[in-house]
A protein has these predicted regions:
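Extended, compositionally biased low-complexity polar/Lys-Gly-rich tracts
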Residues: 3, 10-12, 113, 117
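Aromatic-lined carbohydrate-recognition surfaces of secreted/lumenal glycan-active proteins
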Residues: 126, 276-281
Length: 281
């Protein structure tokens, strides 16, 4: 284990010599009272395949993109007046291998899906969440690794190959993105240091009864920065062409899915989540 140093800014710093791609790691957080929390890195670029959940060191600087033509013209092909038709797909269930494997790799799916959607005349695919998540049954909508493409289908560079292939076939890629809530898995964002850093302390504000998940505290600048930076990350590092935000209604209304007494009104007595609205703007 390596001890982190607390800087005057309030940010912790750590340097570990000899770290290599493929190394796994977690944060061990010791709280007052002697409690210890083992957490995955919220900013990790890769994670172990479930049910394992450690973060994985990767090098994102080696992939050689070949989608220059698409990137140059997408401002026009995705303009306000451009015709767009979108094919929504869950990569894990769209097509299954017949050789006993659970899933195809991103690199295998890419040419098959590109050919299929081109034949049907679609301009874009919308991927149900590919960010890392522990529960298959959630279809990816309960994210624990916001900065990591799920290891179910391969590595980060495998996913870059997928994006690259779609673009070379003139198919845009929209990513489903879930800034509305996150799961309670103990290795994730929930009570990250033993306190509520990403969520509200009051369960009437921080708990989502429909899905059993936690609601982001959009009033915290650190939380907003984490999410906004994440959206920009997928655009920069994976050449995503757009995002589709999931469960927006649950973000907008404080009483969404709740009964009287289960929610807290805003400062004006209304049910609008003012911080979430400001975040969306």
């Amino acid at each position: 284990a390596y001890q982190m140093n607390l800087l005057e800014s309030g940010i912790y710093e750590l340097f570990i010599p000899g770290v290599r791609a493929g190394d796994i790691y977690k944060y061990e957080i010791k709280a007052k009272g002697g409690l210890t929390y083992l957490k995955s890195d919220p900013y990790a670029n890769a994670a172990q395949l479930r049910p394992n959940n450690a973060s994985v060191v990767v090098d994102l600087g080696k992939y050689a993109w070949q989608d220059e033509n698409w990137m140059k013209k997408r401002g026009v092909t995705q303009g306000d007046k451009a015709p767009i038709s979108v094919y929504e797909v869950h990569l894990g269930s769209w097509k299954k291998p017949d050789d006993g494997r659970e899933f195809y790799n991103y690199r295998e799916i890419a040419p098959m899906l590109a050919s299929y959607v081109k034949e049907l005349g679609y301009t874009h695919v919308e991927l149900m969440p590919v960010m890392e998540h522990p529960l298959d049954e959630s279809w990816g909508y309960q994210v624990t690794g916001y900065y990591a493409p799920t290891a179910r289908y391969g590595t980060p560079d495998d996913f870059r190959y997928f994006m690259d292939t779609m673009h070379q076939n003139d198919i845009g890629v929209i990513l489903d993105w879930v800034p509305a809530h996150f799961p309670r898995d103990t290795f994730g964002l929930s009570a990250f240091d033993g306190t509520c850093l990403y969520e509200h302390f009051d369960p009437r504000q921080g708990s989502h009864p429909h899905w059993g998940t936690l609601i982001y505290n959009y009033g915290r600048p650190e939380v907003k920065n984490f999410l906004i930076a994440n959206a920009l990350f997928w655009a920069k590092e994976y050449h995503a062409d757009g995002i589709r935000m999931d469960a927006v209604a649950s973000m907008l209304y404080l009483d969404y899915g709740k009964q009287d007494g289960e929610w807290v009104a805003n400062i004006y007595g209304g049910n609008e989540n003012l911080e979430a609205i400001e975040f969306l703007k």
